[in-house]
From Swiss-Prot:
GO terms for molecular function: rRNA binding; structural constituent of ribosome. It comes from the Bacteria. Belongs to the bacterial ribosomal protein bL21 family. The keyword Electron transport does not apply. Part of the 50S ribosomal subunit. Contacts protein L20. This is Large ribosomal subunit protein bL21. One of its GO terms (biological process) is translation. The keyword Ribosomal protein applies. GO terms for cellular component: cytoplasm; ribonucleoprotein complex; ribosome. This protein binds to 23S rRNA in the presence of protein L20. PANTHER family: 50S RIBOSOMAL PROTEIN L21, LARGE RIBOSOMAL SUBUNIT PROTEIN BL21M.
Length: 103
């Protein structure tokens, strides 16, 4: 059984037991989170596709950890002007483990 749900403006395909990195959620480590924006649920032969959401669909997950991704380097450069600017960005994430998928 797997599901596609939406969180943080992105869609994630998950099954029970999977660990997924999502955009940062303001939830403490060890707590459970419910995602109700379920777009698709597939269980063996049957596939429930929402229009746009599956009615009664829910993905339950447990927050494993919070952290930051690897640094992305940004370089701005102006030719012939002896001007360059180097910056970096590290995005916060929340790692969750999927515990249940309900259709």
């Amino acid at each position: 059984m797997y599901a596609v749900f939406q969180s943080g403006g992105k869609q994630h395909r998950v099954a029970e037991g999977h660990t997924v990195r999502l955009e940062k959620l303001e939830v403490a480590t060890g707590e459970t989170v419910e995602f109700d924006q379920v777009l698709l649920v597939a269980d063996g032969e049957t596939v429930h596709v929402g229009a746009p959401l599956v009615e009664g669909g829910k993905v339950v997950a447990e927050v494993v950890s919070h952290g930051r991704d690897e640094k992305v380097t940004i370089v701005k450069f102006r030719r012939r002007k002896h001007h360059d600017k180097k910056m970096g960005h590290r995005q916060w994430f929340t790692e969750v483990k999927i515990t249940a998928i309900n259709a």
